[in-house]
Amino acid sequence: MPRKTPIERYRNIGISAHIDAGKTTTTERILFYTGVSHKIGEVHDGAATMDWMEQEQERGITITSAATTAFWKGMAGNYPEHRINIIDTPGHVDFTIEVERSMRVLDGACMVYDSVGGVQPQSETVWRQANKYKVPRIAFVNKMDRVGADFFRVQRQIGERLKGVAVPIQIPIGAEEHFQGVVDLVKMKAIVWDDESQGVKFTYEDIPANLVEIAHEWREKMVEAAAEASEELLEKYLTDHHSLTEDEIKAALRRRTIANEIVPMLCGSAFKNKGVQAMLDAVIDYLPSPADVPAILGHDLHDNEAERHPSDDEPFSALAFKIMTDPFVGQLIFFRVYSGVVESGDTLLNATKDKKERLGRILQMHANERKEIKEVRAGDIAAAVGLKEATTGDTLCDPGKPIILEKMEFPEPVISQAVEPKTKADQEKMGLALNRLAQEDPSFRVQTDEESGQTIISGMGELHLEIIVDRMRREFGVEATVGKPQVAYRETVRTVAEDVEGKFVKQSGGRGQYGHAVIKLEPNPGKGYEFLDEIKGGVIPREFIPAVNKGIEETLKSGVLAGYPVVDVKVHLTFGSYHDVDSNENAFRMAGSMAFKEAMRRAKPVLLEPMMAVEVETPEEFMGNVMGDLSSRRGIVQGMEDIAGGGGKLVRAEVPLAEMFGYSTSLRSATQGRATYTMEFKHYAETPSNVSEAVINAKQVGRG
């Protein structure tokens, strides 16, 4: 079956934004204008098509990246049909893992900003992730009809806070309740959308007299930015500022956007049906197709570098980037095809796990509606049914031409809670539900506490775990009670301990056991665990050295202070002895474990706690309360700045996670509900001794 849309006309984009910038409404409008959805779903009444999980509708925040396909021929119908695959990304900080995961498979992104709030803390996180994956982007300043809307302030913030070069290709006509449309700086025409048709129809008009001068000024800046795309253009521009044609300007802006040098900037009000249509045109004009992006790099099974170009003729390769459980078809694996073609029924190799699997059905998704398709080609994003082994980040490829595309990296969870099923019947279902949810979300972990037998769930924040427990109830019918959130402490050492021995000797008639290891233990800040074999002259036979390492690795799970995992230590195996008959792997495993425990006791063990980057936005009159409260939580204030437009103050602080439980409630009461905050994990830091003692004592009481 030939390709319906040439790959040059594909756009795989993400729509990213800070919570409440109106991203879901923007996506809804895209679906409406592209003719996929006929009635506009409003977030205000919880009916948005993209937000298809129940909790999202209640909380009004977007959690899962639903992948949607739409078609667009330009707002004036002047483009050949383009296929736009949209990955909806969440804007809440507890879900940055979702954003990171979708950034990995995008070719371009549209950053949505609130015209009043502008660049907010979460916008910075998303921007950093887009930089990490080198994703070209355009910016859409939404909610231009709000009181306090200021397009140019957001343009400055992108430069100051994000270090991005924002180039307006439109400027707004009016603001707040007087917002009417935009001036297209390329065409130098005003665009006014028609309210009757919900913005489907529009007219080009002359630029209002009061804006002519400003429009010329901003057009000049835009043309100058375009001219820097090449020597020839720059020369042409310098000879005559008005000599660049519309097509030349667009092509040059496109080139610089794809090279991540500039960010074209647009504006509108999705809620009032203004501007989204022009943003779709900008997606086609300025964001890359899969063919504009460099070939994807990976490794073959022998670890040699390999690459795949975005072509149907190359061997099939794809990356699984999301797993979801669907009540009707079971497990759905969302994947992005980088090269080649695959049909339902084909056998694929999961190169990451080295397992072959048969591809069942292939579904194309529109939010949570689906259409079954026969095949997918380079550049497509689709969902597969029937892949049992695949998890997020796995490479799916042609069994004859294996390749492993780069692995995604996922953060370690910082918060844990015990969960108990309410009834015996819930017990079995809970295990199944948690495993299924952990498969979908790599930043969520499940384990059993060996001492208490409790099931412990861990994640990226309180909201993250709240939603997991919520989903367990709704999707799997499991009622569970949840313990108090626990901090994921770690243990490490402060000094060096040398010549520490562990000797395991057992004589009990017949064959005994003998293992003897001498180690040096030292701090290894920020580098995790390292084991160095420094045995000379065969005092410990080669075959037993991995056993010593294994014994130590097992002991790392539970430190000597309070049984928390040990991090950032370096162990040198320096000496030891063995017995011809009695030595075996188990004895050396025990010796390694004993030596490590003793060395850790001697090397001044300390407790580490997760520190969070906290940002609070508060009206000025509550500054004193907010600062006092943060200090009482052992917080260190690192800076304050005015929120643009007289919107109060932004306080940046570093606060231990242990002190942040229930913070939203106390912030509400300290500021009459007028302040907001975001928090994300920063790093681990040593815990003050009085806090350490309390944590260690509590752990011992718990054990006793």
Curated annotation (Swiss-Prot):
Signal peptide feature range: none
PANTHER family per the UniProt record, alphabetical: RIBOSOME-RELEASING FACTOR 2, MITOCHONDRIAL (PTHR43261:SF1), TRANSLATION ELONGATION FACTOR G-RELATED (PTHR43261)
Compartment(s): Cytoplasm
Residues spanning the membrane: none
Role description: Catalyzes the GTP-dependent ribosomal translocation step during translation elongation. During this step, the ribosome changes from the pre-translocational (PRE) to the post-translocational (POST) state as the newly formed A-site-bound peptidyl-tRNA and P-site-bound deacylated tRNA move to the P and E sites, respectively. Catalyzes the coordinated movement of the two tRNA molecules, the mRNA and conformational changes in the ribosome.
Main location: cytoplasm
Pfam families: EFG_C, EFG_III, EFG_IV, GTP_EFTU, GTP_EFTU_D2
A single cellular component GO annotation: cytoplasm
Gene: fusA1
Positions contributing to GTP binding: 17-24, 88-92, 142-145
Domain tr-type G per the UniProt entry, residue ranges: 8-291
Assigned protein family: Belongs to the TRAFAC class translation factor GTPase superfamily. Classic translation factor GTPase family. EF-G/EF-2 subfamily.
GO molecular function terms noted in the UniProt entry: GTP binding; GTPase activity; guanosine tetraphosphate binding; translation elongation factor activity
GO terms classed as biological process: ribosome disassembly
Protein's name in the database: Elongation factor G 1
Keywords carried by this UniProt record: Cytoplasm, Elongation factor, GTP-binding, Nucleotide-binding, Protein biosynthesis
